[in-house]
Amino acid sequence: MTQCHTETMKILHTSDWHLGRTFHRSPLTREHQQFIDELLEYVHAEGIDTLLISGDVYDSTIPTAESTTLLDQALTRLMRAGVQVILSSGNHDSFRRLSYGAAFFEASGVHLRTSLEDATRPVELTDGTLRVHVYAIPYLAPRLHATALGVDPTHQAVLGAVTNAIRADAAERHARGEGADRIIVMSHATVSDTTGSDTAGSADTTPRSDSERDISVGGIDWVPASLFDGFDYVALGHIHKRYPVTHTIRYSGSPLGFSFSEEHNRNGAYLIELNPGEEPTISSHEWATRVHMKTLRGTMDQLLNSPENSPYEQGYYCRIELTDETLPVGAVDRLRSRYETISHLSLIHI
């Protein structure tokens, strides 16, 4: 059982770090390092007890040397700060690679959850007066896990079986006098509020981004929020926009924007504060670290001469949408004479 050090238990919900990600072939190592530095500053300032990372800590099943170094340094700094870390694997991660050294890390306060069996093995947190069980469900590909669970190979059937197993485990612990005051579930999935419907296909209201990998099975990639009924908080990963599905079922979103479709996202995290006898207090936090990107639209003359675009000349990834009748000769070179980084150029007609 993991001991927390403050009267109010503070848990920070993050996900989808995607270490090793590039932005239109430009490495994001610098921005990821800035995010980790900012995260540590916030952890110290707020007195965070536990950090959740709900899947896709890496961008690839074979992470780069730079990305493994970033994670190693982040976990080391968090351990030194006395912060417990609960990390589940996502659809971008290799669950086998991520589980390496799990027993060693567990003893150091880093709890890796990467397998089906891990989903019903909660991390126990306590501050002496409050006991919290965190069940971390890794990404479970239906075709790989449906047979073991005895269900159809769909996301809804697999996640439904696992959440029912979690409820059964929680009930057994309660019967033994080892039950929790609060139950938190982590999951890496597409979850939509269907206003009580438990039939997949009714309505999917999830905001999407083109930087998220498709996980659909039979054309359906989402599950209803009702699968998570009865839990005190559900920390979701996979969707890159920070938003609540319901009051207690939330996506933290990614810490950085990874495509122009996320240009207007306000990336951040959720802080969950727990006190005995009280409902969880949930607040949002916005990261200052940014992947600076901007879509600029206009004629060649407007783009080269408009003073309004001066802030985007340096330090920004620019998506240029030219509205000229035809593509001007030497368009890229002319635009690069003003804008440092042009990540995408297209000719559009409006």
Regions found by a protein language model. Give the residues of each.
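Conserved beta-sheet core of the metallophosphoesterase superfamily
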Residues: D198-E278
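Conserved small/polar residues in nucleotide/adenosyl-binding loops
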Residues: I348-I350
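Active-site environment of divalent metal-dependent phosphoester hydrolases
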Residues: H18-R21, D59-I62, S88-L98, D118-R121, ...
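Active-site neighborhood of phospho(di)ester-bond hydrolases with catalytic His/Asp-centered motifs
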Residues: T14-S15, L51-G55, V85-N91, H111-L116, ...
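Metal-dependent catalytic neighborhoods of phosphoester/phosphodiester hydrolases
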Residues: H24, V57-A74, S89-G109, T114, ...
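N-terminal active-site segment of His-dependent metallophosphoesterases
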Residues: Q3-T76, R80
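Binuclear metal-dependent phosphoesterase catalytic core
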Residues: T120-G128, V132, I137, I249-E313
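Conserved catalytic scaffold of divalent metal-dependent phosphoesterases
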Residues: Y100-S216, P255, N275
